[in-house]
C-alpha cells in the first residue's frame, strides 16, 4: 500500500476515534445530566426532610416546655392551696390565743386565792378549788396546757429563768422553784414559766 492508502487509513482511524470520542462524550453527558437532575431533585427532597425533622424537633421541644409549664403551674396551685389550708388551720388553732392569755390571769388569781385560804372554812376553799379545776379543765379542752414543774429540765423555749441557785435533791439545770406557771396553746408558748434553776 501506498502512502495515500496509509494516509487514508490514518484519516479513517482519526475519524473513527473522533466519532468514538464524540459518542463517549455524548454518552457521558447523557449519564451526567440524569444524575444532575436526580441530584437537583434529591436536594429539595432532602431539604424538605431536614426541614420536617427540624420542625418536629421544635414541636417536641415546645410540647416539653408546655408540659413543664403546666407541671409548674399545678405545683404552684397545690402549694397555694396547702398554704391556705395551713393558714386557716393556724387561724382556728390560735384564734383563742388572746382570750387564753387573759384567762391565765384568772387562773393565777384563783391559785393565789387557794394559797391564801389556808385555815379558812373548808367549804369556801373547796368551792374555789372546784372553780379552779373547772377553768383549767376548760382551758385544757381548748389546747391550753401548763408548763413548768419542779424537777423538770430547764428548756429556754418554755421557761424563763429568773435566777440560778443551788438546790438540794434537784439536778443542775433543772427547775427548783416555779414562780409563775407557763402555758402553751397547741404546743405554741403563750406565756413562758418563770422559774428558778438549780445550779
From Swiss-Prot:
Name of encoding gene: grpE
Compositional bias of kind Basic and acidic residues: 1-10
Annotated keywords: Chaperone, Cytoplasm, Stress response
Compositional bias annotation for Low complexity: 16-30
Disulfide bonds: none
Source species, domain of life: Bacteria
Main location: cytoplasm
Entry-linked PROSITE patterns: GRPE (PS01071)
Cellular compartments annotated: Cytoplasm
GO molecular function: adenyl-nucleotide exchange factor activity; protein homodimerization activity; protein-folding chaperone binding; unfolded protein binding
Name assigned to this protein: Protein GrpE
Chain residue ranges for the region called Disordered: 1-44
Family label: Belongs to the GrpE family.
Keyword Amino-acid biosynthesis in record: no
Subunit structure: Homodimer.
GO biological process: protein folding
The keyword Chaperone is assigned to this record: yes
Role this protein plays: Participates actively in the response to hyperosmotic and heat shock by preventing the aggregation of stress-denatured proteins, in association with DnaK and GrpE. It is the nucleotide exchange factor for DnaK and may function as a thermosensor. Unfolded proteins bind initially to DnaJ; upon interaction with the DnaJ-bound protein, DnaK hydrolyzes its bound ATP, resulting in the formation of a stable complex. GrpE releases ADP from DnaK; ATP binding to DnaK triggers the release of the substrate protein, thus completing the reaction cycle.
Cellular compartments per GO CC: cytosol
Amino acid at each position: 500500500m501506498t502512502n495515500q492508502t496509509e494516509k487514508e487509513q490514518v484519516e479513517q482511524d482519526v475519524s473513527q476515534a473522533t466519532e468514538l470520542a464524540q459518542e463517549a462524550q455524548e454518552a457521558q453527558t447523557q449519564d451526567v445530566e440524569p444524575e444532575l437532575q436526580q441530584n437537583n431533585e434529591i436536594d429539595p427532597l432532602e431539604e424538605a426532610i431536614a426541614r420536617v425533622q427540624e420542625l418536629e424537633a421544635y414541636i417536641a421541644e415546645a410540647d416539653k416546655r408546655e408540659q413543664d409549664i403546666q407541671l409548674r403551674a399545678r405545683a404552684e396551685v397545690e402549694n397555694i392551696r396547702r398554704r391556705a389550708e395551713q393558714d386557716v388551720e393556724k387561724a382556728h388553732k390560735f384564734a383563742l390565743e388572746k382570750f387564753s392569755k387573759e384567762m391565765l390571769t384568772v387562773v393565777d388569781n384563783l391559785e393565789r386565792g387557794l394559797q391564801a385560804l389556808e385555815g379558812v372554812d373548808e367549804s369556801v376553799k373547796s368551792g374555789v378549788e372546784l372553780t379552779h379545776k373547772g377553768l383549767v379543765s376548760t382551758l385544757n379542752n381548748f389546747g391550753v396546757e401548763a408548763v413548768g414543774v419542779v424537777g423538770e429540765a430547764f428548756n429556754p423555749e418554755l421557761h424563763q429563768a429568773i435566777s440560778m441557785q443551788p438546790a438540794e435533791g434537784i439536778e443542775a439545770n433543772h427547775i427548783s422553784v416555779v414562780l409563775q406557771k407557763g402555758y402553751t396553746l397547741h404546743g405554741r408558748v403563750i406565756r413562758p414559766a418563770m422559774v428558778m434553776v438549780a445550779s
